[in-house]
Amino acid sequence: KLFDGVPCPLANKKPGDIDMLIVRENTEGEYSSVGGRMYKNTDREIAIQETIMSSHGVDRVQKYAFELAKLKGRKKVTNATKSNGISITMPFWDERFNKIKKKYPEIKTDQFHIDILTARFVLTPEWFDIVVASNLFGDILSDLGPACTGTIGIAPSGNINPENKYPSLFEPVHGSAPDIAGMGIANPIGQIWSGALMLDHLGEKEAAKTIVTSIEKTLSIKENRTKDLQGSSNTSQCAKAVLDNIN
């Protein structure tokens, strides 16, 4: 989401133009550990890694994307694919998507291959509402999307158990950033916004809304922003500004 006052690296984009959700499958797909290496240390060495897509896993994430669209009042779900090149798993992914979307006739859908989809993220980010993607594609898009708003430092994420049978986990898209630990330059917004996502997931809608509103107020003033957003605040100062705006 592009906030008011935050410098956008994309030309002629303003707050309201970029506000998308990336729904990523996070238990199987391209990041399975099925495979191995053969003929090591020879000139015929081979490395193989399999993509695993199950109807259970694919249906779960795609259904969640549509249910999220209903819950959040979003109007469109975009399918990220590459079935013109990945000839087995991606056609399967598309088949499941085309089946599931029929259960949600009130929600618009479209589909793009991942290469042109990334180009469209940069050229026309306002086109997108909710994008559902495999593990690898979702990993890429969930970094590219925030970068289009100026920094990945503000982007939140959640590893969701849709059935609420088990705990869900919330963290910034950028992870723990150990390379800058203790330097006071990390943007705390991603962590704070992840907390708001958690509250929203737990049903604390007003508390979540209060935090997001405070984030918007904080980022609208340049001095409150960290260096990645051309501001002058350190981590603690930026976090304190968010807290002060809540109070």
Positions of PLM-derived features:
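Glycine-rich phosphate/nucleotide-binding loop
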Residues: 121-223
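N-terminal glycine-rich phosphate/adenylate-binding segment common to multiple enzyme folds
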Residues: 1-40, 45-48, 136
